[in-house]
Amino acid sequence: MAKKVQAYVKLQVAAGMANPSPPVGPALGQQGVNIMEFCKAFNARTESLEKGLPIPVVITVYADRSFTFVTKTPPAAVLLKKAVGIKSGSGKPNKDKVGTVTQEQLRQIAETKAADMTGATIETKMKSIAGTARSMGLIVEE
């Protein structure tokens, strides 16, 4: 028989840098999960990724306090900032533009995020990421 699910915990944790301090410790401690066990497993799974890149993770906690987790791809905004080389998006995206993103960069980001996105083709995923770029104050080259 399948295990009974107690809770789902959604977090964003820096790749290879999970530790028991907030936000990981309190979120998992409330559910009675062994925090160090999660940290070791998460760090092992994300060691191939760039250290410090925020990785969304969904942790399924079962009634017997065991857990499984699924890592997602980094948020599109983080990948866009990295591609353009900026620290943060624009505070006034309709007035102040902070950088330019090319179609090739959009394609690379769409291919990276393809598993976590809806959309039939890579072009529709590129349009979605272009919308994120515009809302951050980036100019999208045609």
UniProtKB/Swiss-Prot annotation:
Q: Explain the purpose of this protein.
A: Forms part of the ribosomal stalk which helps the ribosome interact with GTP-bound translation factors.
What the record says about family reads: Belongs to the universal ribosomal protein uL11 family.
GO MF annotation: an example: large ribosomal subunit rRNA binding
* Maturation and modification: One or more lysine residues are methylated.
Q: Which UniProt keywords apply?
A: Methylation, Ribonucleoprotein, Ribosomal protein, RNA-binding, rRNA-binding
Q: Which GO terms describe its biological process?
A: translation
**Gene Ontology cellular-component terms listed:** cytosolic large ribosomal subunit
Q: Sorted alphabetically, which HAMAP family does this protein's record hold? A: Ribosomal_uL11
PROSITE patterns hit by this protein: RIBOSOMAL_L11
Summarize subunit and interaction data from the UniProt record for this chain.
Answer: Part of the ribosomal stalk of the 50S ribosomal subunit. Interacts with L10 and the large rRNA to form the base of the stalk. L10 forms an elongated spine to which L12 dimers bind in a sequential fashion forming a multimeric L10(L12)X complex.
Look up and give the organism this protein is from: Haemophilus ducreyi (strain 35000HP / ATCC 700724)
Q: Which Gene3D superfamilies match?
A: Ribosomal protein L11, C-terminal domain, Ribosomal protein L11/L12, N-terminal domain
- What name does this protein carry? Large ribosomal subunit protein uL11
